[in-house]
UniProtKB/Swiss-Prot annotation:
Family in the record: Belongs to the dicarboxylate/amino acid:cation symporter (DAACS) (TC 2.A.23) family.
Name listed for the protein in its UniProt record: C4-dicarboxylate transport protein
Location of the protein in the cell: Cell inner membrane
Record GO terms (molecular function): fumarate transmembrane transporter activity; malate:proton symporter activity; succinate transmembrane transporter activity
Organism the protein comes from: Serratia proteamaculans (strain 568)
């Protein structure tokens, strides 16, 4: 029994995170030098994301009986994303107005170092709904795979899947080849995941070593408020959605506990995307639904990022004594409904979208971003964790609404019954 615990990925990653925190705190210089370990692991995962999405989506769509079902799944998923992410934005706005973590700081924007956020402001100028939509279309198929752009790969995979489906029996050979290639890809993922503890250790040691615990204490009220809001959103909002669709949010969180720990260590929900695709299938969701909902959700269903954006923007206004009436806050909400859709599930993207939003609203001081910059890394963990749970719940819900969910397998797996999907997931180590 003890040996089984030591071999579990959950235990290994938890131990690695703890060691990373200790190293970063007591030996910050050494901890800061551990960054390549975390970066290397995330790069290994990114290397495999494009082929995983391609194989999953193509085999899922090509294997469906009707193409109308694919269109229906996509429409339902986008509707769900819009409703839930809007709720997340509203909850963030409500809590930050009630708690007011920035009130009383009385910071003069002119005294802040705007140079520190200049690079983010420059990137933010490139944000916009039209450039975002045009960017979904790749310049070339090879370019989409080379850059690892999730939505570009997804678009090509959907078109490829449709074309393969129309070939019928003539395309069976290609279908079999892609399915076999998919098995090889997931074999590679299994090997990469053995390095997850090392990646989590390096990323956490770097974060604590570079930014220190002091930066946590300095703006602790905002961080605590944000973390509690994310917990509230998962338990109350996602919990209610899960319950209404026949499963427990707590059992679901337990099911993906290893993925949550990896995300906690790396601060990026993208680091477990391939593994989530596999686990959601094991949970009883059809491959076609998983292949569409999970990758799309990484741009359109970022609940944690939505909460962060409203809270951070209003916090800057409170800290700099910038008055925001109802009209200003409604304007902020409308802008965020568009700009938040461009925040991919990678570390730092939320901060860039925040910069874009503040630039678009115009009422808030852009220099106020310097207040958030020092603690953004610590807030990214809660963002990524909430995003991951949100996308997992969305997949189950959309699968159920589209009648593409094996509910018996869902309940057996979440209850950890022998022979269920819970004991068929990728080996840990």
């Amino acid at each position: 029994m003890k040996l089984t615990i030591f071999k579990s990925l959950y235990f290994q990653v938890l131990t690695a995170i703890t060691l990373g925190v200790l190293l970063g705190h007591f030996y910050p210089d050494i901890g800061a030098q551990m960054k390549p370990l975390g970066d290397g692991f995330v790069k290994l995962i990114k290397m495999i994301i494009a082929p995983v999405i391609f194989c999953t989506v193509v085999t899922g769509i090509a294997g469906m009986e009707s193409m109308k079902a694919v269109g229906r799944t996509g429409a339902i998923a986008l509707l769900y994303f819009e409703i839930v992410s809007t709720i997340a934005l509203l909850i963030g706005l409500l809590i930050v107005n009630l708690v007011q973590p920035g009130a009383g700081m009385n910071i003069d924007p002119g005294t802040l170092d705007a140079k520190a956020v200049a690079v983010y402001a420059e990137q933010a100028q490139q944000q916009g709904i039209v450039p975002f939509l045009l960017d979904i279309i790749p310049g070339s198929v090879i370019g989409a795979f080379a850059s690892g752009n999730i939505l570009q790969v997804l678009l090509f995979a959907v078109l490829f899947g449709f074309a393969l489906h129309r070939l019928g029996d003539k395309g069976q050979l290609i279908f079999n080849v892609i399915e076999s290639f998919s098995r090889v890809i997931f074999g590679i993922i299994n090997m990469i995941m053995r390095l997850a503890p090392l990646g989590a250790f390096g990323a956490m040691a770097f974060t604590i070593g570079k930014y220190g615990v002091g930066s946590l204490l300095q703006l602790g009220q905002l961080i605590a408020c944000f973390y509690l809001t994310c917990i509230l959103f998962v338990v109350v909002v996602l919990g209610s959605i899960a319950r209404a669709n026949g499963f427990s949010i707590f059992k679901f969180v337990r099911y993906i506990k290893e993925e949550l720990l990896i995300v906690l260590g790396t601060s990026s929900s993208e680091s477990v995307l391939p593994r989530m695709l596999d686990k959601m299938e094991k949970l009883g969701c059809k491959k076609s639904v998983v292949g569409l909902v999970i990758p799309t959700g990484y741009s359109f269903n970022l609940d944690g990022t939505s909460i962060y954006l409203t809270m951070a923007a209003v916090f800057i206004a409170q800290a700099t004594n910038t008055h925001m009436d109802v009209i200003h806050q409604v304007t902020l909400l409308v802008v965020l409904l568009l700009s938040s859709k461009g925040a991919a599930g990678v570390t730092g993207s939320g901060f860039i979208v925040l910069a874009a939003t503040i630039s678009a609203v115009g009422h808030l001081p852009l220099a106020g971003l310097a207040l958030i910059l020092g603690i953004d890394r610590f807030m990214s963990e809660a963002r990524a964790l909430t995003n991951l749970v949100g996308n997992g719940v969305a997949t189950v819900v959309v699968a159920k609404w589209c009648k593409q969910l094996d509910e018996k397998q869902l309940h057996d797996t979440l209850s950890n019954k022998p022979g269920s999907g819970a004991d068929k997931t990728l080996p840990s180590a």
